Amino acid sequence: MEGRLANMWRLTVNESKFVETALQSELRVDGRGLYDYRKLTIKFGKEYGSSEVQLGQTHVMGFVTAQLVQPYKDRPNEGSLSIFTEFSPMADPSFEPGRPGESAVELGRIIDRGLRESRAVDTESLCVLAGKMVWSVRIDLHILDNGGNLVDAANIAALAALMTFRRPDCTVGGENGQEVIIHPLEEREPLPLIIHHLPIAFTFGFFNKGNIVVMDPTYVEEAVMCGRMTVTVNANGDICAIQKPGEEGVNQSVILHCLRLASSRAAATTKIIREEVEAYNCERSLQKVKRHPTLAKSEVSGPTVAVKEEHRKSSDQERAAEISREHVERLKLSTEEVRSSKEEEAANFKGGPSNWDPYSEAMDVDSLKVSLASRGDPVTKSSSTKKMNGSGNAQKVGVEISVEEVTGELGKKDTKHKDGEMTLKDAVKPKKKRKNKS
């Protein structure tokens, strides 16, 4: 099956000679130098632990997941790290769905050896309960387009996905202290993986019996080259892994030359990955700030409830303070308006006669005479002037009152009481007419 699929696409003799002749002149088909790297682009998805890497025409997507499992008996305090690759039929005519072929298995082994044997990921931090529960991290790599040098692109996709992955926080509790509680993302912030260094893979292609070496071979160059070697190094120059498939031998000097090239390139590639990851984390933190007010309802412990209650109290106090500030501002505005209106009235006042009348229009002259007589004041001829209906037309009302007239009227009233009407004095019997009770 592998032989049949491998023979589906071949370069012609003229194409092969053209590529080899160009390499002898230190030229490549895509215009690069022998040790130049193609353009690297890294993107991230909305979920934690998803990455998309494009190296020239090569397109690889990585996704990281984790689950709680029982640890291995020989390593009860360490988690596990596994890598799985999947070749899409759209990426290359030689790929077909189903069971992974030799190329897929080899790709997974190279990346796994560079990550796990170099101890790049701290597996001891993945332990939750020694001997019973640890985190198992799984990396899935999907080949979307094969433009050559799948190992380097897949390795960068795996590293980018691991650096942006977050696992749920968990605690050990319960009655016996052996119960593992996984906290949701809304309740507690997820935790990143502890990565000590970034092992970067670099692939070299050999031509003309190992006399010509190129870095980052393309799909066409891979069909012509007689051998290849993958070197995994970090930014410090430490060699993490070396993989050389094929039967073609290579001199020791060529291998050392490849190691020097990989070490010089590792720092630049590591810088690109870290910058992209930092930019993604900053964007993610901004989105997280907007998402925090809408927390999902969940049953939480006492300290968490207390924190929520304090948060509610502080929010209520802030609202009350805002309302009081609004009321104070409204009162200030109203007082300012009143002051301005009074100032305008005072400014517009020009002075003039008052229209105020101390007496009402329907004044009775007889009642006025009686009231003056009751006071006992000597009454003489007087005149009072009043203004009717607020107009300037004044009417003089002369009132002549004498003591005799007032006493005459009072005498008339007394005679009326004596003649016909009964008074309170008449109702009381004198002492002479009262009957003795004895």
UniProtKB/Swiss-Prot annotation:
Gene Ontology process terms (BP): RNA processing
Keywords: Cytoplasm, Nucleus, RNA-binding
Annotated compartments: Cytoplasm; Nucleus
Lineage of producing organism: Eukaryota, Viridiplantae, Streptophyta, Embryophyta, Tracheophyta
SUPFAM superfamilies: Ribonuclease PH domain 2-like, Ribosomal protein S5 domain 2-like
Reported consequences of knocking out the gene: Bright green glossy stems and siliques due to reduced cuticular wax accumulation.
Chain spans, region Disordered: 293-322, 334-438
Bias type Basic and acidic residues, positions: 307-322, 334-347, 410-429
Name listed for the protein in its UniProt record: Exosome complex component RRP45B
Gene Ontology molecular-function annotations: 3'-5'-RNA exonuclease activity; RNA binding
Biased composition (Polar residues): 380-394
Family named by the database record: Belongs to the RNase PH family.
Top-level taxon in the UniProt lineage: Eukaryota
Coiled-coil portions: none
